[in-house]
Amino acid sequence: MASTKIDDKVSIPGPVTGTGNSRFLIVSHENGGIWDLVRFGVWGNKESGDKFLHYSAGGGLLEEHLVRSDDSGGGDDRGGEVPDHRWVIFVSIIVRKLIAIFGKPMEWTGYLVEFFLNLFSLNGNFLGLLYNILHGKVVMPHRGSETFISAIGHLDGRINLYKSETLTKEIGEPDFWQKIGIGHRDLMDLCMMASKLAYENEKVVRNVVNLHWKMHFVDFYNCWNDFEKEMSTQVFLLCDKPKDANLILVSFRGTEPFDADDWITDFDYSWYEIPKLGKVHMGFLEALGLGNRTNASTFHEQLFVNNLKFANLENVHATIPPSESSKSSTSFSDSDAHTGSDLSSDSERPTDTRKKKFRLEIPERTAYYVVRSKLKRLLKEHKNAKFVVTGHSLGGALAILFPAVLVLHEEVDVMERLLGIYTYGQPRVGNRQLGRFMEAHLEHPVPKYFRVVYCNDLVPRLPYDNKTFLFKHFGICQYYNSLYIEQNINEEPNPNYFGMRFLVPLYLNAGWELIRSFTMGYMYGSEYEECWESVMLRALGLFLPGISAHSPVDYVNSIRLGKARSTQMSSF
């Protein structure tokens, strides 16, 4: 078989920041067969490994890519046994192959599950549906309508904020920004609820933000992932009020339970090395629209070349009066796939010719550039506002990488108004160098990045990490055990999820969570009573504990019921 090295050296005219000679490693699960995988995983056969592993021509030996967590120096661990890392990648490829095999069945199952969940809900559950069938009054669900709720929304039907009136009042106080930190429960609750709401369609998001939270819905975006060739990245923005806002929130959608591509991304070990930042998870960069692994040079082009192009367009757009620029774009239609045009959230097309030109010249409908442009306009319009970025699961990964790229692009004025980054059940996004880079910008003068992890949630333990492997968490970890006891630590317990000494506690804990689901309403009130969908997921947790622990139900409960750890307690 021909060499699998991919030449990512590109020559791009004009002044650019960074280099086109970056290093990368792509782990492809679809190329080789099972026998190739066995030969690579068990015996370390290089020819078989080359079918799965593609790496940059200038990056040195493949073993370097597998063993060394950071080649930039600075005190990182070096060495390690190549077979250990080969085994990790071997398991990753198997899992991704299995997910890919069940990709279509997962998608069909998702459609059926969400259809019947909404059918029962709209007709008053099972008995109500039978009654409506007999009387010819069945209400049919319509995907994309204001009454169609996602599977995640059915797991946790809570839509109201913890203390919405208190939060709205506090945001307007002059010293509110000094109160922000790990312990600000109301803001953490808003971020978690927004992360959960991001799984819904635009109409549901708009209704909840405007009618229930009494805030101002700004925009909802469906953004292009060039590798997946679909609009698979969703994000929405809100302000605490329409005029003179004090708070702007950006919420990225997370891993959808029936989306095979999302789960494959979570289990992916591919990375791309960005100058200054370090090695970053390639799948998450693709979700932000910042490249496509089928042509590695596109990462350099999106990160550096298009940044200069787009910055010039933003400067042109800055000349438009705020009253006009406040009419912004939301989701894109398929017909606009390669024009970069979009529609305003109130279905009105802008009449200003300069604004039309700006829209048509947007390089791509990518999440990073679209959100950055809108955020800069909002910050210009609301002079006193600060912004937070949030997300659950994969959305949490995008929430931390979005400001990371802002720092890379030296968006100093924007980053000065960052209030905080709150992620929930977030997977690992890069290596130690990325962690050091971001901590230097987010830890001083006060911490601005808070990573919340519930108990045995599987996703924060992905991709796999050990003393020498690539992916590392960074920032403050706010960890909650299954009793909702809070602890601030550097790394969650059982950081890699697997291991015999953790196996029995994992299943015991899953059994306890199933029992607890029947008592929550009695212990804490009707607001915490778990629906039958959530109980069924708990039952599934008896077989896959880490999956059930990833539910937003426990993250909302952790924030609202969480108690500071006062004595030495088990992580059970």
Swiss-Prot record:
Any one Pfam family match given in the protein's UniProt record, by short name: Lipase_3
* Region named Disordered: 320-356
The listed locations are:
Lipid droplet; Membrane
GO CC, sorted alphabetically, is: lipid droplet; membrane
Q: What is its EC number?
A: 3.1.1.-
The record ties this protein, via InterPro entries, to: AB_hydrolase_fold, Fungal_lipase-type, OBL-like
Bias kind Low complexity: ranges: 323-334
Known Gene3D superfamilies for this protein?
alpha/beta hydrolase
Q: Motif range for GXSXG? A: 391-395
Question: Topology with regard to the membrane?
Answer: Single-pass membrane protein
List UniProt keywords, sorted A-Z: Hydrolase, Lipid degradation, Lipid droplet, Lipid metabolism, Membrane, Transmembrane, Transmembrane helix
Q: Where are the transmembrane segments?
A: 110-130
Q: Which reaction does it catalyse?
A: 1,2-di-(9Z-octadecenoyl)-glycerol + (9Z)-octadecenoate + H(+) = 1,2,3-tri-(9Z-octadecenoyl)-glycerol + H2O; 1-(9Z-octadecenoyl)-glycerol + H2O = glycerol + (9Z)-octadecenoate + H(+)
Cite a single GO BP annotation.
lipid catabolic process
Role, per record: Acid lipase that can hydrolyze a range of triacylglycerols without a clear preference for acyl-chains. Can also cleave 1,2-diacylglycerol, 1,3-diacylglycerol and 1-monoacylglycerol, but not phosphatidylcholine, phosphatidylethanolamine, or sterol esters. Required for pollen tube growth. Triacylglycerol hydrolysis by OBL1 may provide acyl groups for the synthesis of membrane lipids in growing pollen tubes.
Q: Which family does it belong to?
A: Belongs to the AB hydrolase superfamily. Lipase family.
What is the name of this protein? Triacylglycerol lipase OBL1
